[in-house]
Amino acid sequence: MSQIKPSDIDLSTEICGARQLNVLQRHHMAEPQLDWLAEEVPVALVYNGISHVVMMATPKDLEAFALGFSLSEGIITAPQEIYAIDVTPSCNGIEVNIELSSRRFAGLKERRRAMAGRTGCGVCGIEQLDDIFRPIAPLPFTQTFNLNQLDNALAQLKQVQTVGQLTGCTHAAAWINPQGELLGGCEDVGRHVALDKLLGVRAKQPWQQGAVLVSSRASYEMVQKTAMCGAEILFAVSAATTLAVEVAERYNLTLVGFSKPGRATVYTHPNRIQE
């Protein structure tokens, strides 16, 4: 991918996922100036006519988000189980209508019945601690990554942050190959949404060898989503939580935090990491 610089962006045109507003800057309080802000809108994921969840997201790459979310949440196991995705703006946000296979929709309805009455956060309402861990088969050990290639990948991360370079307001998630080349990526104001978008893109690409690189910290949900989609290595620019490490250990995922030039902290399964 070629390097994108802020100077390469035509600021006279509309940018998907960002818009301009008048603001007042320190030392220039008498003169309003135009500034770019990232968009954050409610996005409803609707499966076979039934609204499943509303997420706050940047309104770009929403088809990839729908596919990646469906995979990382275990609603489907393969892209072919979604027959159609239709993105429709509404007065209050955006609806993403997803047509599921009848088998997967039946499974989703059963899950919704089991979840009835729970609150919105990821862990709240779970009756047993073991319920935090999804029944994901432990990952195989088929991947390796040399940390000498990590700096090259980090230098390319901003390439997928067109909105982020204008606003300073988005997270990035990217797929990097063992040579440290960034093959593709996505951005969003939400780190989980950025990751889901990437996982949706990856599901349609022949990307097998490599790792996930995210610009954020690594929470247990980020680890779980990555493992659910079969990726064996997750690099996070910031730290990992204790639960993220525990989940990564259980699923055989190699988790690396503080992934910065000349630096990396390997938390789990270091046998995949070379130097």
Curated annotation (Swiss-Prot):
Its main location: cytoplasm. Keywords: Cytoplasm, Molybdenum cofactor biosynthesis. It is found in: Cytoplasm. One of its GO terms (molecular function) is sulfur carrier activity. GO terms for biological process: Mo-molybdopterin cofactor biosynthetic process. It holds the Pfam family FdhD-NarQ. It comes from the Bacteria. The active site is at C121 (cysteine persulfide intermediate). Mo-bis(molybdopterin guanine dinucleotide) binds at F258, S259, K260, P261, G262, R263. InterPro entries: Cytidine_deaminase-like, FdhD. GO terms for cellular component: cytoplasm. Coiled coil: none annotated. NCBIfam families: fdhD_narQ. Required for formate dehydrogenase (FDH) activity. Acts as a sulfur carrier protein that transfers sulfur from IscS to the molybdenum cofactor prior to its insertion into FDH. Belongs to the FdhD family. This is Sulfur carrier protein FdhD. The lineage of its organism: Bacteria, Pseudomonadati, Pseudomonadota, Gammaproteobacteria, Enterobacterales.
